[in-house]
Swiss-Prot record:
SUPFAM superfamilies: Nucleoside diphosphate kinase, NDK (SSF54919). Its main location: cytoplasm. Residues 1-66 are annotated as: Interaction with AKAP13. It comes from the Eukaryota. SMART domains: NDK. Belongs to the NDK family. Major role in the synthesis of nucleoside triphosphates other than ATP. The ATP gamma phosphate is transferred to the NDP beta phosphate via a ping-pong mechanism, using a phosphorylated active-site intermediate. Negatively regulates Rho activity by interacting with AKAP13/LBC. Acts as a transcriptional activator of the MYC gene; binds DNA non-specifically. Binds to both single-stranded guanine- and cytosine-rich strands within the nuclease hypersensitive element (NHE) III(1) region of the MYC gene promoter. Does not bind to duplex NHE III(1). Coiled coil: none annotated. HAMAP family: NDP_kinase. One of its GO terms (molecular function) is ATP binding. This is Nucleoside diphosphate kinase B.
């Protein structure tokens, strides 16, 4: 069995407010990825500042933190073969205008400042983000009954 990796996916306040949570979760499930953790929360400013620490010197950073704090988010951990890379492909480009139809951003959003979803950009980032948003005991380990139908 090939190596299973994990990624962090967060549905942003605009995705929650627009009622897109179910559609997004469905896409990851239909692809064959396994949900390991999920929580619905209003993220604290401290958590968001730490999450986006790499962007702190960018001019849009304060607005990004304010926007992410403006409403609830759905934080998730997904697991599967190449889930980081494949998950990013499923999301589409950061700027929805550059996203292809069939991707989450290509289908559901218009502007970069309201692009409805975040996904880890590397395995290393995923590990950092997962540990920031979830305690180890919140990650549920189980074997999906569909596992043998998805993986050789």
């Amino acid at each position: 069995m090939a190596h299973q990796e994990r990624t962090f996916i967060a549905i942003k306040p605009d995705g929650v407010q627009r009622g897109l949570v179910g559609d997004i979760v469905k896409r990851f499930e239909q692809k064959g990825f396994r949900l390991v953790a999920m929580k619905f929360l209003r993220a604290s400013e401290d958590l968001l500042k730490e999450h986006y620490i790499d962007l702190k010197d960018r001019p849009f950073y304060p607005g990004l933190v304010k926007y992410m704090h403006s409403g609830p988010v759905v934080a998730m951990v997904w697991e599967g073969l190449n889930v980081v890379k494949t998950g990013r492909m499923m999301l589409g480009e950061t700027n929805p205008a550059d996203s292809k139809p069939g991707t989450i951003r290509g289908d559901f959003c218009i502007q970069v400042g309201r692009n409805i979803i975040h996904g880890s950009d590397s395995v290393k980032s995923a590990e950092k983000e997962i540990s920031l948003w979830f305690k180890p005991e919140e990650l549920v380990d189980y074997k999906s009954c569909a596992f043998d139908w998805i993986y050789e």
